[in-house]
Amino acid sequence: MSAIVDIVAREILDSRGNPTVEVDVELASGAKGRAAVPSGASTGAHEAVELRDGDKSRFGGKGVLKAVEHVETEILEALQGAESMDQVAIDEAMIDLDGTPNKARLGANAILAVSLAVAKASAEELQIPLYRYVGGVYARTLPVPMMNIVNGGQHADNPIDIQEFMIQPVGAPTLADAVRVGSEIFAQLKKNLSAAGHNTNVGDEGGFAPGLKSADDALGFITKAVEAAGYRPGDDVTFALDCAATEFYRDGLYVMEGEGKTLDSAGMVAYLADLAARYPIVSIEDGLAEDDWEGWAVLTATLGKTVQLVGDDLFVTNPDRLRRGIKAGVANSLLVKVNQIGTLSETLEAVETAQRAGYTAVMSHRSGETEDSTIADLAVATNCGQIKTGSLSRSDRTAKYNQLIRIENELATAARYAGRTILKTA
């Protein structure tokens, strides 16, 4: 057991070249923990608030020096001498110090960086891995990756409305094999796109961002790449979508400019049901807008028995919004983004709330990432069985896959790859 003696913060860059917060926490024993926080492009209106400086003379107003200052003054003063392993008390102290419902005063970026760095320092103090410290002795499930190999929406400069087209190597025997399968398909997709005259530039999350105009185009290319790489769509590899529908929801309608469609909620549900009937799509994230609760109920009634319906902007990793969804029977899965809620303990509460209600949980990165691989450990710690951490390019994405490979290697025969156990059955 060791007390916090010092907290140091700094402004670093994320994968988009924007400033973010990194924090070092030092304990009396000399143990240290470091954490850097991500940021999102398509952010939910109900997320905890990132504090930005607003000084247009630095980083176009996106600087985080105010958040850094809050860490090194108010937060340090509140936590200095606190027991590092009392994570809930530490997180609650920062929440109380902030005094707002969405962490807007101190900044969720400041609070989260400290929260995660404290956990890492505590793990270092005990000389155990972070996944073991957070998850205990039964933390051993390696997650199925949702690999974002075609980017659209807010993550790419192309006409595709849907934000992410992902593959899941459910048929692989191990996590390391799943990463290999994904890499092989990604390489094949690059060849196919290039041969068809499309660019192979990558988007924020490392997937390709070709000038395709429809979901059918993207899914068609992915299907052919899976087959050409020697795998069977729907058996070895399943598909997942992140529609990020809030981004094209206007005045009660879903305006899909790339598709040339304007749909009401029922029309959007029918559109998604048609895609799921024609392709091996087993998971759809944010298929409807964050406050279209009635539409979500229809989507859940239509597809919820056979398709994982993931709430991201809908739930924003917030236990209260999740409980509302559970009570209403809306969605059946929670996307877990630590910076949406802003502390480790609240993140774990959200995962526990989901799992107790029979909802699945998917650990997730953000589009603006760093080399910090904490979410890989958290995916194993929570045994959630699924992770979204981008494509098979960009070191900010592959850092998480590499950490999962290390964890699987360390767990040895105790490791269990989730594989097909994540699939819903009618």
From Swiss-Prot:
Enzyme Commission identifier(s): 4.2.1.11
Residues forming coiled coils: none
Protein localization: Cytoplasm; Secreted; Cell surface
Entry annotation: catalytic residues: 205 (proton donor), 337 (proton acceptor)
Protein's recorded name: Enolase
Enzyme class: lyase
Origin organism lineage: Bacteria, Pseudomonadati, Pseudomonadota, Alphaproteobacteria, Acetobacterales
Entry cofactors: Mg(2+)
Pathway(s) the chain acts in: Carbohydrate degradation; glycolysis; pyruvate from D-glyceraldehyde 3-phosphate: step 4/5
SMART domains: Enolase_C, Enolase_N
